[in-house]
From Swiss-Prot:
This is Ribosome biogenesis protein WDR12 homolog. It holds the Pfam family NLE. GO terms for biological process: maturation of 5.8S rRNA from tricistronic rRNA transcript (SSU-rRNA, 5.8S rRNA, LSU-rRNA); maturation of LSU-rRNA from tricistronic rRNA transcript (SSU-rRNA, 5.8S rRNA, LSU-rRNA). It comes from Brugia malayi. Keywords: Nucleus, Repeat, Ribosome biogenesis, rRNA processing, WD repeat. WD repeats lie at residues 114-151, 153-194, 203-242, 270-310, 312-351, 357-397, 401-433. It is found in: Nucleus, Nucleolus; Nucleus, Nucleoplasm. Transmembrane segments: none annotated. Belongs to the WD repeat WDR12/YTM1 family. GO terms for molecular function: ribonucleoprotein complex binding.
Length: 433
């Protein structure tokens, strides 16, 4: 992918603004720079037409029309050039650099699948989509909406799930209102797929609301309404945290069962209200971040078995996601605002940006795993929005279709966005890559 850069020189004259645009392509040095004069009230659409026309004229090769976004000082241009200059207090005598980047492809509605109950959690990998319902059922689908298999794993609503990264096999951990976590294998025999529960993780005293797993799937953390963060050994070969099996009353022998019970490695306290979302830090294998209804983000060191930092907010949190490359955080709260945090910052406010666009509580946020500028947010306003961190006032796209509150979303696969909620439907949106 190549980038187009433009230098805009502005001078105030008696009749208004005279703006000169110098266009050149970084990746194609043989294309000479080209200077144009444009009006200051030029819009993004007209700037797109001008950029494409200019590139077509100055390129010695056949040029295919491209839709661009335009960056000024790391902010995507969404207004006229004049409005941007005035709003951002850009000196009109200065040289303004405009970077033209290829627009992200729009997600198109793909699958619309009805289930029997609310969808409380959803996750996706390169093989399947996993959706969990308030009826306690885990359902697996292929990327095109075909049902692969299902299994009722919990006695009450499933509130969270995570896919354990494992090169040999697929495993899923679910947490529910029944206070337990269930670890299951996904087995494939020929064209058939099965969900096989292998471990039940017991220790929480109230509903389990949050799950996160480390990069190799050997450790899992969970949190819930008991305010506790629990650490579990989910290594396939672990026997150290296996709880003693119950014995048969009649024979005095251990029951024959494929499902074992595990207890937590450690239980950590610190939050004053429910833990509702958790992520493993990409910067340290021993750090976990949690958000709570107590208005705080907690950073935990699992080796030290305690909190090492706490970030305070004015609202109760609902969701957190972390950028794999930068370590930046996005959070959802009980208001319509998505917030961007830099937990490593020691200067000024830790909230670096607020993203305005929703009109209901933010229920779920998810960072794109390929591009560090992109993320999605789901809301009680029935929409999923796709954002670029360089445009905090206008989302790139609105993904519509849900008829009631959205409870969960996922963007683990770059070309596929999935969501589910109170309308008992799972929706997928596909991007052409």
């Amino acid at each position: 992918m190549w980038k187009l850069l433009a230098n805009v020189v502005s001078n105030v004259v008696s009749q208004g603004w005279e703006v000169f645009v110098e266009v050149f392509v970084v990746s194609y040095r043989h294309i000479p720079s080209h200077t144009l004069s444009v009006p200051t009230d030029i819009t993004v659409d007209k700037l797109n037409m001008l950029a494409n026309k200019t590139l077509n004229n100055i390129s010695d090769k056949e040029f295919e029309s491209v839709a661009f976004d335009f960056l000024i000082s790391s902010t995507i241009l969404r207004t006229t050039l004049e409005e941007f200059v005035q709003e951002n207090h850009v000196p009109v005598e200065s040289v303004i650099s405009i970077e033209c980047i290829v627009q992200e492809p729009a997600p198109e509605p793909d699958s619309d699948i009805a289930l029997l109950d609310w969808i409380g959690a959803i996750r996706c990998n390169d093989k399947f989509i996993a959706s969990a319902t308030y009826g306690g059922e885990l359902v697996l689908w292929n990327h095109y909406g075909k049902k692969l298999t299902s299994s009722v794993l919990h006695e009450e609503a499933i509130k969270c799930l995570a896919l354990l990264p494992d090169q040999k096999e697929d495993r899923i951990v679910t947490g529910g209102h029944d206070q337990v976590l269930m670890l299951s294998d996904v087995e494939t025999h020929g064209s058939s797929t099965f969900i096989k529960p292998t471990c039940v993780l017991r220790g929480h005293e109230r509903s389990v609301e949050a799950i996160a797993v480390n990069t190799d799937g050997t450790r899992t953390v969970s949190g819930g309404f008991d305010k506790m963060l629990k650490v579990w050994n989910t290594d396939k070969d672990d026997t150290s945290t296996v709880f003693e099996k119950t014995r048969s009353e009649k024979t005095g022998k251990k029951k024959r069962t494929d499902i074992i019970t595990k207890i937590p490695m450690v239980t950590l306290s610190g939050h004053k209200d429910a833990i509702v979302s958790a992520v493993w830090s990409p910067n340290s294998a021993k750090e976990v971040l949690t958000v709570s209804w107590d208005h705080t983000i907690s950073i935990w060191d699992l080796e030290l078995a305690g909190q090492i930092n706490t970030l305070a907010a004015k609202k109760a949190f609902t969701s957190i996601s972390v950028c794999c490359s930068s370590g930046m955080l996005i959070t959802g709260s009980v208001d319509p605002v998505v917030r961007l945090w830099d937990p490593r910052s020691h200067e000024g406010t830790l909230v670096k940006q607020s993203f305005i666009g929703h009109c209901g509580w933010i229920s779920s946020v998810f960072w794109n795993k390929v591009k560090e500028n992109l993320f999605i947010s789901a809301s009680f306003d029935k929409t999923v929005k796709m954002w670029d961190v360089r445009s905090n006032k206008t989302p790139l796209y609105d993904l519509v279709g849900h008829s009631d509150r959205i409870l969960c979303c996922d963007w683990s696969v770059n070309e596929l966005i999935v969501s589910g909620g109170v309308d008992c439907t799972m929706k997928t949106y596909r991007r052409k890559m």
